[in-house]
Amino acid sequence: MSVVIDTNVLVVANGKHEAAGTQCMGACIDALAQARTARVVIDDAQHILTEYRKHGSFAGQPGVGDAFFKWLWQRQADPRHCLVVHITPHPKRGFAEFPADEQLAKFDPSDRKFVAVALAAGDAPPILNASDTDWWPVRHALDAHGLTVKFLCPELMAGAER
């Protein structure tokens, strides 16, 4: 099984999101623990790892998100733990793999890499999201493209409809 993980899951697991309570943080910690038994999908140009690096520590501490980042970084070339896919830059959509769908036209450009790697993976891995409300309004459009967003902290999605 493969999984795509939005950076906010690491941030919440580190306890660095003010609106995330203990239940949300626990869900993120559990999800990262489960991800260690799956294959984490990343891209060969390191768009995802570069973003993780901005929020995670190579020391692997003090938080669970930091520990996960260090673990993933050390295993990025190990096909037992990582599925590395190629995503193609696109001038308008960000990535060619990102759907040309009007319902997704306003989706956050910085999150498009997660959709692109999920589609490039070929097995429709779930995308884990903790706190980013941009995913909520497009969940049905993504579903139409065979993708599922797993909302680890649904309580943070209140009022996210546009």
Locations of regions flagged by a protein language model:
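Short, well-structured N-terminal submotif of metal-dependent ribonuclease cores
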Residues: 1-44
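A short acidic (Asp/Glu
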Residues: 14-16, 51-56, 138-142
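Short, flexible/disordered intra-domain loops and linkers
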Residues: 14-22, 56-59, 100-105
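PIN-domain endoribonuclease scaffold, especially VapC-family toxins
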Residues: 33-37, 46-98
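Acidic, PIN/NYN-like endoribonuclease modules and their adjacent C-terminal/linker elements
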Residues: 44, 119-162
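Active-site neighborhoods of divalent-metal-dependent phosphate/nucleic-acid chemistry enzymes
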Residues: 81-127
